[in-house]
A protein has these predicted regions:
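Acidic, proline/glycine-rich low-complexity IDRs
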Residues: 1-6, 114-169
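Long, charge-dense low-complexity segments
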Residues: 2-29, 34, 38-41, 90-94, ...
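Glutamate identity and glutamate-enriched acidic tracts
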Residues: 20, 28-31, 73, 77, ...
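N-terminal core-binding DNA-recognition domain of tyrosine recombinases/integrases
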Residues: 21, 34-137
Length: 169
């Protein structure tokens, strides 16, 4: 029996999984989700299509003039803010494997010429993910490996993706 100042415990909050809420985004970005998922599989790195849909939805949610223009700052914002905000607004769990999915998605964009030529080169975009704990293979960095020097918010003055692709670097 509860005393006069005691209240019964609140029921636990149960958040839906990403799979339970991502359906509309998968439909909206169907072509990109299918193409990226197939590309990842062909690279020997199968990926959950829901993670690709989440990236696409988070990019689309932010008002951007050019969704194909990628910079280190944009990758950092997507990873640290946009994906988390999308999950918060959808009231679902934020997936732990988003860094690896973004690594693969950026590779897909570069390999299929879907990066704006003015984008930072793929390796510089992936620096943000190295800073966030991935190794050079796009998988979590093993324990004991040195941290990656963060330059996510420093101005980038090197060649663009277009210059790298054209061999003009």
């Amino acid at each position: 029996m509860l005393g006069p100042s005691q209240h019964p415990p609140a029921p636990p909050v149960v958040l839906p999984t990403l799979a339970e809420v991502i359906g509309p985004a998968r439909r909206e970005h169907h072509e990109t989700v299918v193409d990226a998922t197939q590309w990842c599989h062909a690279q020997g790195r199968p990926i959950d299509p829901d993670l690709i849909a989440l990236i696409c939805a988070a990019v689309a949610q932010r008002d951007r003039d050019d969704p194909d223009l990628w910079t280190r700052e944009r990758v950092s914002e997507l990873l640290s803010c946009d994906v988390r905000n999308w999950c918060s607004m959808a009231r679902c769990w934020h997936p732990d494997s988003q860094r690896e999915a973004l690594w693969l998605f950026l590779g897909f964009l570069a390999a299929t010429d879907r990066l704006d030529p003015a984008s930072h080169p793929l390796d510089r975009l992936r620096d943000v993910l190295r800073c966030a704990g991935l190794g050079d293979d796009g998988r979590p960095r093993p324990e004991g490996m040195p941290d990656f020097r963060c330059e996510c918010h420093r101005p980038y003055c090197g060649p663009t993706q277009g210059e790298v692709s054209a061999g003009l670097e």
